[in-house]
Amino acid sequence: MANDILLKIEGLRASVEDKEILKGVDLTIRKGEIHAVMGPNGAGKSTLSAVLAGKPQFTVTAGTVEFLGQDLLAMSPEERAWAGIFLSFQYPVEIPGVTITNFMKTAVNAHRAGKGLEPLKAGDFLKLMREKMAFVQMKPEFAKREVNVGFSGGEKKRNEIFQMAMLDPTLAILDETDSGLDVDALRIVASGVNALHTPDKAAIVITHYQRLLDYIVPDVVHVLKDGKIVKTAGKELVAEIEEKGYDNL
């Protein structure tokens, strides 16, 4: 059904510094679906996530992107976030001097303002924060720490899943979230993603490896190679990639 389409990408081409990275990407994501985008290094996976999030260093040269029927490419990065798009970075940045509590309070209330809602009252915000921290198994003392400063790789990724839980996006884009994680951290990240997934929401999981997809089971798997999606199938494609590699698909 057309009304269950969350994201529709047609003929998307994008470049950075006059170098074309995406060379005609077509992708349709429906509500309730988890899509995995796999591919070799340099295929354009992170460029795709950056273009969807609206990072300014990338120039869209052709194609259309609709999110819930709206022209996504016409929106600013802030408007995309307010509309319900969340991007989890491969390398989360450190923000010295800013506690997680203050960072999240600003982010949550900015999202609410973008939707025409009043800021959360202090008590309601702290209650929400406690619930979501417990949800992703973050210790309460993390709230007082500076954002990602001195965090291990696993703590940084867990913090991002916590941010995702707080902002409650309609479309979550996880860009190589499994990078540098041990198995325990991987399980926690995956369980958080799975628990946040509902029939009205969707996720794009961008990864180079199979192991994350042992814990987050995709409905659809795409192989992105040289800026184009060259193969789309069900979750069985993950095992085929593991067996044959990208060159022999």
Q: Over which residues does each language-model region extend?
A:
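Conserved structural motif at the start of ABC-family nucleotide-binding domains
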Residues: 7-9, 22-24
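Short hydrophobic beta-strand immediately N-terminal to the Walker A/P-loop
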Residues: 35-37, 49
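The feature captures the beta-strand-to-loop junction immediately N-terminal to the Walker
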Residues: 38-43
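ABC ATPase NBD Q-loop/coupling interface
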Residues: 64-80, 148
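ABC-family P-loop ATPase nucleotide-binding domains
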Residues: 93-170
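Walker B catalytic motif
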Residues: 173-177, 184
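Conserved beta-strand-loop-alpha-helix hinge in the C-terminal portion
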Residues: 220, 224, 228-249
